[in-house]
Amino acid sequence: MKRRRRWRGWLLFLALCFCLLCEAVETNATTVTSTTAAAATTNTTVATTGTTTTSPNVTSTTSNTVTTPTTVSSVSNLTSSATSILISTSTVSGTRNTRNNNTTTIGTNATSPSSSVSILTTVTPAATSTTSNNGDVTSDYTPTFDLENITTTRAPTRPPAQDLCSHNLSIILYEEESQSSVDIAVDEEEPELEDDDEYDELWFPLYFEAECNLNYTLQYVNHSCDYSVRQSSVSFPPWRDIDSVTFVPRNLSNCSAHGLAVIVAGNQTWYVNPFSLAHLLDAIYNVLGIEDLSANFWRQLAPYRHTLIVPQT
């Protein structure tokens, strides 16, 4: 009987210990793992023995690409344009062929003869207005032409006449003060003259400076001459300056052969055909390349005695 009681006591004791052990295990040995995934948040629960720790680990990565639109407004470039004429200064070299297939020599420097010649050209156009339909003037401008030096090569042959419609030259003509009148022989054939004195009787002594002045307008070309005083370097004291030259009609735009050049020097007046005067000027251009303006000058002019210069008193 005593052994059975002992065994019962031990069994009860073991059962009590077993129950206590089970409770301890249920209380202290619990592992909880919880993972919650959100769109931008992750909660991680770390399992520890006897302790439950919840550590929120928030990881939010946002990649924002902001595109700012660039607005380019259309800009109208307003260019204010005015009617204008572009004039350039140039130097033209060479020879000019005419209808007779001869080479024309233009201009020279009387004080310094050379094998090439030049003309100093000054062009001053008139003011021009642009008128609208209602008659209002919309723009006024006066274009200016610069100086232009034209250089050509002297021709070995006889040059043709220079048309005053293309070359209106300001010349200086002189007459001998001892002469009351001037007689110019008009003859198509070249006479055989014995000496240089006879040339002096036939030819009117003259000196000139070439300066071209052309007045351009929209309708026509206005020819005018400006006459300068004798240069101090020219040693021709017995000669007298020309007083005035007038072209009739004033505008030779149609290049009519009926025009006249009225030359006044002192108390004498000459009525010169502009075309004939052009022939004479060509002759002067051609011979001023010689070294001295002596008797050879008149001899060289002899082929051009058909030039009509009629003195009037």
From Swiss-Prot:
Highest taxon of the lineage: Viruses
Record field: compositional bias (Low complexity): 90-114
Chain positions carrying an annotated carbohydrate: 28, 43, 57, 77, 101-102, 109, 149, 168, 215, 222, 251, 254, 267
Signal peptide feature range: 1-24
Keywords of this entry: Glycoprotein, Signal
Entry annotated with the keyword Signal: yes
Region of interest: Disordered: 47-73, 90-117
Family: Belongs to the HHV-5 US34A protein family.
Protein's name in the database: Uncharacterized protein UL116
Organism field: Human cytomegalovirus (strain Merlin) (HHV-5)
Lineage: Viruses, Duplodnaviria, Heunggongvirae, Peploviricota, Herviviricetes
